[in-house]
Amino acid sequence: MKLEHPDRLMKRTPLSLAALETHDAFAERHIGPDAASQQAMLDTLGFATRAALIDAVIPASIRRAETLPLGPFAQPLSEAEALAALRELADKNQVFRSYIGQGYYDTHTPAVILRNVLENPAWYTAYTPYQPEISQGRLEALLNFQQMVADLTGLEISNASLLDEATAAAEAMTLLQRVGKPQSNVFYVADDVLPQTLEVIKTRAKPIGIEVKSGPAADAAAANAFGVLLQYPGVNGDVRDYRALADAIHAAGGHVVVAADILALTVLTPPGEWGADVAVGNTQRFGVPMGFGGPHAAYMAVRDEFKRQMPGRLVGVTVDAQGKPALRLALQTREQHIRREKATSNVCTAQALLAIMASMYAVYHGPRGLKTIALRVNRIAALVAAGVKQLGFATVNDTFFDTLTIDTGARTAQIHALANAKRINLRRVSDTRVGISVDETTTRGDLAELLGVFAQAAGGTAPDVDALDAGLADTAALPAGLQRTSAYLTHHVFNRHHSETEMLRYLRSLSDKDLALDRSMIPLGSCTMKLNATSEMLPVTWPEFGRIHPFAPAEQTVGYREMIDQLEQMLVAATGYAAVSLQPNAGSQGEYAGLLIIHAYHESRGESHRNVCLIPASAHGTNPASAHMAGMKVVVVACDAQGNVDIDDLKAKAEQHANDLAAIMITYPSTHGVFEQNVREICEIVHAHGGQVYVDGANMNAMVGLTAPGQFGGDVSHLNLHKTFCIPHGGGGPGVGPVAVGAHLAKFLPNQRSTGYARAEDGIGAVSAAPYGSASILPISWMYIAMMGAKNLTAATETAILNANYIAKRLAPHYPVLYSGPGGLVAHECILDLRPIKDSSGITVDDVAKRLMDYGFHAPTMSFPVPGTLMVEPTESESQEELDRFVAAMIAIRDEIRAVEEGRADREDNPLRHAPHTAAVVTANEWPHAYSREQAAYPVASLVANKYWPPVGRADNAYGDRNLFCSCVPVSDYA
């Protein structure tokens, strides 16, 4: 119910409680334009109502007949009510002291990082740093991450994060397949690798014909494998010397991947020093909560010779137009948005925000602080070992960093029961063994309590911790030959910001360099940069969500699983499908899972030969990259002059491949920003030829409440919760990419059998390390849907379409709108064609993007899906005032271009070619340009009151790739 104007309320008598209550208050804050603004925009478009506009935009044949069936969430909750309801669910979780380990550890998030990174919209609302000039802060933080990982692993170069340790290991496998010996298709996994990692590797290997063998590490050299994966330390705690083994593997023509504990590497010889070619792992224990499995930043580091084969994003150093150091994403030609099915990986969004947290943890503690934490953890583990031995138990491993495997024999069940009574979780290794992994949060009191459990089981008295400590030799459990001697984190950034004052100011200095949603609209097409409301973000830091281990017993995670079940049903309602899995921890992984599900379906019908995937020429690069990873053959379907799928070409190719057609991948609305009229026909053609229909959910923000892929012919879709459902982009992650399926595919949804999570009888293997992927950020989407309710979710979709059409209408006289549907209308985004401008003036789309920075805007999506264009998506969250500000900037830029066209401005010496303009350039003693300083920096009057200054001039991309440098820059270079 919308609140009336206070003056009108005061005149009404009598006032009622109902008249004063509102449950739509959140929706009115989430949706940018108020009723008056919406009507003004509708008037501009020539429509009387929003409903009339929607009727003209969306084909009647696919319109949803019913209101979103959200059940108990059909009516919106207020922010307070939603937080209270989620608190009830959170309180059903039980936060036990976790000693489970297996790749996940409790950790202390420094408060200065919690408040100023994780809870700071300047960091979490930013987009992937494709526009480097306005992304220098997070690029520096990610460069710190790369330096940290390279130093700790002892390898030459690291990427800027991957999704989790298991998928990073799978990516390493495919990397080594590309560079390894061609006569082998075997990848060997040591039997002490994390079980969830092995399962993800098997899932990834099967469709591309890699044979995975697992056994003792000692047998790896004889396996004739192109690659070998070793865990360091092993899952049961052993710290083994693999130097001779690595030499033997190399002598046999193979390569070595090491999954290494990031904290252990501060005290153990790094894998790069004993023969590893690739190192992978998780940085979660560097200040990032366990979060029931994620999100966390995985890492990959490689030898220099493999840098161009490395997946994921890579930050490199270049120079700007003034010759000063500038950071940028390097070697982008490896990535799916350029290489498509030939890309090194389908990964887009990774885990930038979590990588930034982990890097700042290292910056804050420095090398000395990290080593102190590691030595303390190792000391506590040694005290546990000494204590249980004193009580008569034997440890299986004599060498260890933080993990012990203990022979407990017939007393195993009793020990688990006693531990449970004290709210302690131990790892269930077997019926006769338990595992204990300690971490930086383990206290002296925890240690005494833990030893008390074993003492009670043994019928004895717990040893005194101080007495144990006094009698224990130094680093007795770390093999002498594997104790680290090489220096690490020597760069000044890791040795300067150790007081909270210094750290606070460093974080502020970085965030001030960047342009995020807290400053202005980010109109990136196909990215849906909408509001990430504060109330949605608050639960992410609740310990009832953050301190839960992903493999905690089910009875301790009741609230989590209820919330997840509810969110799955919300997404079922939104998509029109029958079931949803939240395991995929990025859109790329949801896409990949969907294709594996399609393959499993065909296989179950005796048609495993179906392997052709039809993909329109306009598709996002992840589509062909994912199809290739799923073992499918990509066949491109042409698009017509209007940007729609060419039906005749589709029919011909469906007929040609009728015997081996697996699927078609379409995006709806299309990547051209249009609701194609014949989408039902497309689905029917593919079904008639034995294929399944994959509908990419990247543009779901134009469909919620109005139409649904599961109702117009889709069989499977992935969603991007970090687009449509308000999880922030985090500067390049985290994301969540649920996979939604029709009833006939539900039994093939992902499982994780290695950890006892069996969701579906014939489910595909795990696609993420944890059963529920990035579980700790799922409350964001739950909150958004609960606070919006069915009616307001639909209103948000309608407003997103209204805003896009308003921008298209206002800018059409200045920039041609490349594609539109009937009546010249678009969906939730529009493509502006700048190609004629280049022909008439020499001004490129890149020039316009950089000039927008001078106006205080992030550029729209450049040259996708059509080179030389800008794709604009305003979302529903932007007000008419902000839309008008963007329109004014674009019109002003068009006037600047016209000056070049008409000869009033030089083709080279003009404000577009030299954009962006930094404060240093504008205030320099010399001004060599024909245009004024004022035109450079303050092209519109509104900037005088609120000016964002890009910290660097235009980055030289070619220089950066020719002179690849991906480590921290010396301070002297900035002088």
UniProtKB/Swiss-Prot annotation:
The UniProt function text for this chain reads: The glycine cleavage system catalyzes the degradation of glycine. The P protein binds the alpha-amino group of glycine through its pyridoxal phosphate cofactor; CO(2) is released and the remaining methylamine moiety is then transferred to the lipoamide cofactor of the H protein.
Q: Give the signal sequence positions.
A: none
Q: Please list the cofactors this protein needs.
A: pyridoxal 5'-phosphate
Its GO biological process annotations read: glycine decarboxylation via glycine cleavage system
Which protein are we looking at?
Glycine dehydrogenase (decarboxylating)
Q: CDD domains recorded for this chain?
A: GDC-P
Single GO cellular component term: glycine cleavage complex
Q: Which InterPro entries match?
A: GcvP, GDC-P_C, GDC-P_N, GDC_P, PyrdxlP-dep_Trfase, PyrdxlP-dep_Trfase_major, PyrdxlP-dep_Trfase_small
Q: Could you give the subunit structure recorded for this chain?
A: The glycine cleavage system is composed of four proteins: P, T, L and H.
Q: Which organism is it from?
A: Burkholderia thailandensis (strain ATCC 700388 / DSM 13276 / CCUG 48851 / CIP 106301 / E264)
EC number, UniProt record: 1.4.4.2
Encoding gene (name): gcvP
Q: Give the molecular function GO annotations.
A: glycine binding; glycine dehydrogenase (decarboxylating) activity; pyridoxal phosphate binding
Check the record and name the Pfam families matching this protein.
Answer: GcvP2_C (PF21478), GDC-P (PF02347)
Task: Name the family the entry cites.
Answer: Belongs to the GcvP family.
| Positions of modified residues (N6-(pyridoxal phosphate)lysine) | K723
Alphabetically list the UniProt keywords.
Oxidoreductase, Pyridoxal phosphate
Record keyword S-adenosyl-L-methionine present:
no
Catalytic reaction equation(s): N(6)-[(R)-lipoyl]-L-lysyl-[glycine-cleavage complex H protein] + glycine + H(+) = N(6)-[(R)-S(8)-aminomethyldihydrolipoyl]-L-lysyl-[glycine-cleavage complex H protein] + CO2
